[in-house]
Amino acid sequence: MKKILMIIILSLFLSSCGEKEESEAEEETTTELEGTWKTACYTNSDNSTNIDTLKFVGNVYTRKDQRYSDTACATVYKLEEITYTYSEGSAVTFMSGNTGRYFKITLGSTYKTTPQSASAVNAFNSSSKCGFSNWELNTAKDCDHDEDDAGSNLYGLYQLVDGDKLYASIAEDSYPNSVNTNDTESTFTKQ
C-alpha cells in the first residue's frame, strides 16, 4: 500500500513539473525568423531610396524604414520605426521545395520618426508632422497612427531559402497566395 501511495505522489509531482515546463515554454515564442533581416538598397516612386530592416524577437516584429534622399542609399533623410505584434499561421511548401508560413501582424498605436537631415527637419516642422513643430536633427519622436490604422491587422506570407534569404508579401484584407522573389523591396537577407 505504501508503494502505491508513493507512486501516486511521485506521479502527481512529476506531472505538475511537466505542466510548469510546458507553460514556461509557451511563454517564450521563438520562430525561424528570429533575428535581424535587411533589404538591399531599392528605389521608391519619388526617386528616393530605402533600406529596410526587420527584427523578430519572440512575437514582436519591428520594421525600420531607412529613407535616403539620393539614388544610391548614401545620404540619410529620415528613419521610421514601426512595431507590430507577430503571430504565425500555417506552414507552406512552395513548388521550388522551399518552405514558408502564413503570418499576421498587428499594428501598435504609435511609431517613431527621426529626421536625419536639415531638409527633413524643415519639412517636418513646416508640415507639423505628427502634430509637432519643434523637430530637431537626429531626435526621435513618437507619432500616433491614424485611428483607423492603430490595432489593424496585416496578412502575410513568407518564403525562406537556405535559412538566410527571406521573401515576404503583405496584404491588408486577406492572406497573399504568392511571394515575389524578384522584388528587392520584399527580399531580406539575414544579418
Residue map of PLM features:
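Contiguous, well-ordered beta-strand patches that form the walls/edges
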Residues: A40-T49, K64-G163, S174-K190
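Short, solvent-exposed coil/turn segments at beta-strand boundaries
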Residues: L33-E34, T53-T62, L157-Y167
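Bacterial Sec-dependent N-terminal signal peptides
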Residues: S11-W37, F188-Q191
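Sec-dependent bacterial lipoprotein signal peptides
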Residues: M1-S15
